[in-house]
Design a protein with these regions (language model features):
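Long, low-complexity, charge-biased intrinsically disordered regions
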Residues: 1-244
């Protein structure tokens, strides 16, 4: 929890402020979750401070909240094309993604217990805090603007699929799913794109794609096949209903 608060302060997510008389502060809470791999095994326990977005008032502190995500058709199409082209297939994670996007609206939040010296204080958000209704949309717009800045264009069939064209050829495809990026393309192009994004965002290269959008991804590069399964999802459903 202390690491989470330190990271938020480091990134300048908020500034202490007085609550205007005509406004209500959005509450915050701690959310604890387990991160699992493609087999459903727990790999990390995380604690995150989030805003109680359900208390935000439409037209006062939120005006737009829709954030598109790629459909399963995008996943299947990209993987099939990757196998056919024998391209690299990578998984990148944007660290503390939402707080890298600016908050355009005036949002005031009250920090809950567990925030150290900040507990109980009213702050104004400068960055997009997890849990606020527009935060996902803000980060999506930031991600797309960065990709367009380095030469990508959105595909007409799905705005969550972006392509980089060089000399009339598609050399890289990226499908962002919230803070996860599925990246495929020619090796030199993928390496160049990685460095360009790292100059603008904090990203972690997770290596070859093996788990994405809740699906386990298995590749046989020699046979040029890619298989997707939902092992982790099935395990979670069985655990939830006590049928393990």
């Amino acid at each position: 929890m202390s690491d989470e608060i330190s990271g938020l302060v480091k990134h300048g997510v908020w500034v202490e402020a007085d609550l205007p008389p005509d406004r209500k502060a959005v509450g915050t809470k701690w959310v604890f979750k387990r991160k699992v791999n493609q087999f459903g095994d727990v790999t990390q326990h995380k604690g995150r401070l989030v805003g109680k977005g359900y208390t935000q008032l439409w037209g006062i502190d939120v005006y737009a909240s829709f954030m598109p995500t790629p459909g399963v058709e995008v996943l299947r199409t990209v993987l099939a094309y990757t196998a056919h082209q024998d391209w690299e297939l990578c998984h990148w994670d944007v660290r503390q993604a939402f707080i890298q996007a600016d908050m355009d609206e005036d949002i005031y939040v009250r920090l809950c217990d567990g925030c150290g010296v900040w507990s109980g204080k009213i702050v104004k958000l400068l960055k997009s805090l997890y849990g606020c209704r527009q935060s996902g949309r803000n980060f999506y717009l930031l991600m797309v603007s960065i990709l367009k800045e380095i030469g990508f264009e959105q595909c007409g069939a799905d705005q969550c699929l972006l392509r980089l064209v060089c000399d009339g050829r598609v050399v890289t495809l990226i499908a962002p799913h919230v803070d996860d990026l599925m990246v495929t393309g020619e090796l030199d192009s993928v390496n160049w794109v990685r460095e360009q994004i790292r100059q603008r965002l904090e990203i972690e290269d997770l290596g070859d794609l093996c788990f994405y959008m809740g699906c386990e991804v298995t590749r046989d590069r020699h046979a040029r096949t890619i298989t997707i399964r939902q092992t982790a999802y099935v395990k979670e459903v069985c655990r939830r209903y006590g049928t393990e």
